[in-house]
Amino acid sequence: MATIPSVVREITLVGEQIFDHTQVVRAEIDRFVERFERNERHREFDGILRASHALVESSETPVEGLFDMGKMEHMTQCVDDITKKLQTLVEPKYQKEHDVYLEKVKEDQKKYVDVCREQAMNKMRSMTAHR
C-alpha cells in the first residue's frame, strides 16, 4: 500500500497541494478552451447567440403597426398564393394524362372492333350470296 510520502514523491507535490486541484482544473479548462477554439465551436456559439438575439428582437417588435399598414394582409396573400401553387404541384398531373391516354386507347379499340365486325359481316354476306 502506498504511503502519503511516497505519493507526494511520485506526483511531485507538497503535502498541502495534494488536495488542491487548482492546477489540474486550470489545465483541463485550458485544454477545453484550446479544443473549443481549434474546432471553431465559438463560431457556432456566436451563431446561436445571434439567433437568440433575433428571436428576442422579433418578440419585442410591435406588430400592430404592421397590421395598420396592411403589410400583414399583403404577406398573408403572398403566403396563400404560394400555398395554391404548391398544391397544384402536389396534384399528380400524370393521372389526367393517363386517363386521356386510356380513353384514346378505348376509342381506338372500339373503332378496331367495329371495323373487324364490319369485315366479318361483309364476309358472311358474300358467303351467303355465293351459295
UniProtKB/Swiss-Prot annotation:
It comes from the Eukaryota. One of its GO terms (biological process) is endosomal transport. Transmembrane segments: none annotated. GO terms for cellular component: BLOC complex; BLOC-1 complex; transport vesicle. Belongs to the BLOC1S5 family. Component of the biogenesis of lysosome-related organelles complex-1 (BLOC-1) involved in gut granule biogenesis. This is Biogenesis of lysosome-related organelles complex 1 subunit 5. It comes from Caenorhabditis elegans.
